[in-house]
A protein has these predicted regions:
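Structural motif
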Residues: 23-25, 43-44, 81-82, 292-293, ...
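Acidic, contiguous N-terminal accessory segments
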Residues: 1-72, 259-266, 270-274, 279-280
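A generic structural signal for short, non-catalytic loop/turn and secondary-structure boundary residues
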Residues: 18-20, 30, 39, 76-78, ...
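Residue-level preference for nonpolar/small residues embedded in alpha-helices
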Residues: 2, 6-9, 97, 140, ...
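Short acidic, S/G/P-rich loop/turn micro-motifs used as interaction or catalytic elements
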Residues: 2, 33, 91, 300-303
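Catalytic-core regions of glycoside hydrolase
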Residues: 205-207, 220-340
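Feature activates predominantly on carbohydrate-active enzymes
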Residues: 40-258, 323-325
Length: 340
C-alpha cells in the first residue's frame, strides 16, 4: 500500500467533508480482516484490507463525531465492488465531475469504477471515432486514472467491440467494418485491425489490465452485410468466433477481458436473456474461453430464485462471473428506488 497516496487521499477527503475537527489517524492494512474503526477521544485507529475500506471507515468516523461509540466493525463481502458510469448517452461527464464521483465512491468504500465509453474516447488515427461527442483524450483518462488510484479505486475501461457502435459506424470508417448500422462484421480483418487500435488506446490510457469489451445486445448479428457475403451462420457460432478473436488480441496486449453475457445466453437458447430453464445443462452450448469474464447484468427481476438460476448458468460458461445490478435512473428525472 502506498501510504503517501493514502495521506494525499485523506487530505482530499477531509477537505471534501469539510471537517474542522482535529484528528490523529492511525491505519493498519492486513489481509482477510473486517473494517474496524476504534476511537479514543480524537484518536482514530482503523484496521482494514485496502485503502478503499479505510476511506469508508474515515468518512463514517468523521460524520459521527458526537455519537457514543468506541468501536465499529463490518465484514467485507466482495473483493471488488463499484459502479459503471455511463459516458455514452448524449455527452460525457467532465473530468472534474468524474473526480467528484470518485470521492463519493471513496466515502462508500468502493474500489472499482467502470467508465462506459462506447466510442467517447480517443483512438489514434481514427479522427471520426467519438467526433462531436465530447470524447475523452488519452491525457484526460490518465488524469482520472491517477486520481482514482489515490483513493484505491481501479478505473476500468468499458467499451464496445461488437454492437452499440452506431455513433462510430455512421462515419466513413463504418463502411468497411459494419455488418448492420451498429454492429461490426464478424470475421472481417478490418474489424480486428480497428479493435486492436481501440485496445491499444485503452492500454495506453488506463493503468489497469482489466477491460470490459461489451458485446451485448447484438440482436441482428450476422444478418446484414455478413449474410449477403457469407450466407447464414448461427449467432451462437458468430459470438464465439468473434469473442475468441478479440480475446487473442487482449492476450497479445496483456489485457484481462470480460464481456456482457447476454449474447451467449440468447444465441444458444433462441429465447430471451432470462428465459432459461432451472435445470439448464450448458454442456453442448457454444462457450467462450473459460478465462473470459462473463458479466451477468440484471436490472429487472424481483425474485431471488431467478438470480440464483442465472448465476448457476453463468458458472457453467465461465470461471470468472461478475454481477452487474442497476440503479434505476433511466425512466424518469429521479431514481426509481422500488426497482433499484
Amino acid at each position: 500500500t502506498d501510504l503517501k497516496k493514502v495521506e494525499e487521499g485523506t487530505q482530499l477527503l477531509l477537505g471534501d467533508i469539510k471537517s474542522e475537527k482535529e484528528l490523529e489517524i492511525q491505519v493498519e492494512f492486513h489481509e482477510n480482516v473486517p473494517l474496524t474503526i476504534a476511537r479514543n477521544g480524537d484518536h482514530l485507529h482503523i484496521t482494514c484490507q485496502e485503502p478503499a475500506h479505510y476511506y469508508r471507515g474515515l468518512n463514517w468516523a468523521v460524520l459521527h463525531p458526537e455519537d457514543t461509540w468506541n468501536t465499529k466493525s463490518e465484514p467485507v463481502y466482495f473483493s471488488k465492488n463499484g459502479v459503471m458510469l455511463d459516458c455514452s448517452r448524449n455527452a460525457v461527464f467532465t473530468v472534474e465531475k468524474v473526480k467528484s464521483f470518485i470521492r463519493i465512491m471513496a466515502k462508500l468504500g468502493m474500489n472499482t469504477l467502470m467508465l462506459y465509453t462506447e466510442e467517447t474516447y480517443t483512438v489514434p488515427d481514427e479522427p471520426y471515432f467519438g467526433a462531436y461527442r465530447g470524447r475523452y483524450s488519452q491525457d484526460e483518462i490518465r488524469e482520472m486514472d491517477a486520481y482514482a488510484k489515490t483513493f484505491g479505486i481501479e478505473l476500468v475501461p468499458c467499451i464496445q467491440t461488437l454492437a452499440h457502435l452506431h455513433n462510430a459506424l455512421k462515419w466513413p470508417l463504418g463502411e468497411t467494418v459494419k455488418d448492420t448500422a451498429d454492429i461490426l462484421q464478424v470475421g472481417k480483418e478490418e474489424v480486428y485491425t480497428l479493435i486492436e487500435k481501440m485496445l491499444c488506446s485503452v492500454k495506453e490510457s488506463f493503468s489497469t489490465n482489466r477491460v470490459h469489451l461489451g458485446m451485448d445486445e447484438a440482436a441482428h448479428l450476422g444478418l446484414g452485410k455478413y449474410l449477403r457475403e457469407n450466407g447464414y451462420t448461427k449467432s451462437s457460432v458468430l459470438i464465439r468466433e468473434h469473442s475468441a478473436r478479440v480475446f487473442e488480441i487482449c492476450k497479445k496486449l496483456g489485457l484481462e477481458p470480460m464481456i456482457w453475457s447476454d449474447m451467449y445466453i440468447t444465441a444458444n437458447t433462441g429465447g430471451s436473456y432470462y428465459d432459461v430453464a432451472d435445470d439448464t445443462d450448458c454442456s453442448d452450448w457454444e462457450k467462450p474461453d473459460p478465462e473470459l469474464g462473463l458479466v451477468y447484468w440484471d436490472y429487472y427481476n424481483p425474485d431471488q430464485e431467478i438470480y440464483e438460476k442465472m448465476i448457476r448458468v453463468h458458472q457453467q460458461l465461465s470461471n470468472k462471473v461478475i454481477f452487474a445490478g442497476g440503479s434505476w435512473i433511466w425512466n424518469g428525472i429521479s431514481p426509481n428506488y422500488s426497482k433499484t
